[in-house]
Design a protein with these regions (language model features):
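Alpha-helical transmembrane segments of polytopic membrane proteins
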Residues: 1-8, 160, 207-211, 252
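Juxtamembrane/interface segments at transmembrane-helix termini
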Residues: 16-27, 75-88, 176, 205-206, ...
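Membrane-embedded helix bundles of polyisoprenyl
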Residues: 67, 165-177, 182-266, 279-302, ...
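Start-transfer (signal-anchor) and selected internal transmembrane alpha helices
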Residues: 2-77, 278-283
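Membrane-interface starts of transmembrane alpha-helices
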Residues: 54, 58, 62, 148-155, ...
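Membrane-interface coil-to-helix junctions
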Residues: 70-168, 190-212
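Juxtamembrane loop-helix boundary motifs flanking transmembrane segments in multi-pass membrane proteins
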Residues: 49, 91, 150, 182, ...
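Structural signal for the C-terminal ends of transmembrane alpha-helices
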Residues: 12-25, 75-76, 178-179, 221-227, ...
Length: 308
């Protein structure tokens, strides 16, 4: 299914290229309609950033359309065969049952909090021979709370697609941060979101798309630190990354380390020891502070390992 979907996507890319002009005209027409609606509900004083808003809106519409087309083509075999993205090995045996327990446990926590009971359930005897209650700090994972238990299987597949969308959108933010064209951002985001690794790993382990979502915005945060010594964004994202998974954070940290070294070495403005060590110390401090924000995930993870 996956390789057939990738083949269909390759054909679609080659077919769509000659129609880029038609697509641009349609994109412009949609943006003009939305701008008229925007002009009705806002005042002139509130439209100071109109050009920037127009550009971002045009890009977001274009990216969304491209993503939907590519997603339909890639996952068409699943749709035709009435299949879900639940892998029969880990997905059916681990991930979906964990989601069921999660959407049952979180409401219970809030009920206990509002009733003044802080003696939370910490162990679940209905999981195999018994296990600690698993809580995910991944923001996307919490979207499962929007679905009823009867819809979890469909929600599982839907949120995997959402992760693909967010991965491409994250790459879009990186490309646009460097002031590249919309075409460059479209190309990079679609190729990134539907890369071989993303298709292969994401359809089996949806959480493996989380580091793909975080990496591009971590690079943006690193770039802001290198250029302007602004470390706040990197600190927050390190904390969020650690909350999602310490494993994903350390893998992304390796990529960020390589990026930092190459950025310093390949940029004449920063190619000196003073800048290298100065920015390096700021990064280390930012990482320590960010890790402090997300350290609760380490306690819960290693607590589970030590008690298993």
């Amino acid at each position: 299914f996956v390789f057939l979907g990738m083949f269909l996507a390759f054909i679609a890319i080659n077919i769509c290229v000659p129609f880029a002009g038609i697509y641009a005209a349609l994109e412009e027409a949609v943006v003009n309609i939305l701008e008229r609606v925007w002009g009705i509900i806002t005042t002139p004083a509130s439209r100071e950033g109109e050009e920037n808003w127009r550009s971002l809106l045009r890009y977001f519409i274009g990216y969304t359309v491209l993503f939907v087309v590519m997603a339909v083509l890639i996952f068409l075999p699943y749709i035709l065969q009435n299949k879900t993205l639940i892998w029969e090995a880990d997905g059916l045996g681990q991930y979906v049952p964990k989601v069921y327990r999660f959407i049952q446990y979180i409401p219970e926590i809030f009920k206990d909090i509002f009733s003044g009971n802080f003696d939370f359930k910490q162990y679940d005897f209905t999981t195999g021979l018994g296990a600690t209650v698993a809580i995910s700090y991944d923001p996307v994972y919490w979207l499962y709370l929007l679905f009823s238990p009867a819809k979890i299987e469909k929600a599982y597949s839907f949120l995997i697609i959402v992760r693909y969308f967010l991965a491409g959108l994250s790459m879009s933010g990186l490309v646009l941060y460097f002031k590249k064209s919309h075409f460059a951002a479209y190309t990079a985001s679609i190729v990134y979101a539907f890369s071989g690794y993303a298709i292969y790993a994401g359809t089996k382990h949806g959480q493996f798309l989380t580091p793909m979502i975080l990496l591009p915005i971590l690079v943006v945060a690193m770039e802001r630190l290198i250029r302007n010594r602004k470390w706040y964004m990197l600190t927050v994202l390190v904390g969020v990354s650690l909350l999602c998974s310490y494993y994903f954070l350390y893998m992304n940290t390796i990529a960020l380390g390589i990026y930092f070294v190459l950025r310093i070495v390949c940029t004449e403005e920063y190619r000196n020891w003073k800048t290298f060590f100065e920015r390096g110390f700021i990064i280390v401090g930012s990482y320590i502070l960010g890790a402090s924000l997300g350290v609760i995930s380490l306690f819960t993870s290693f607590g589970s390992y030590m008690g298993s």
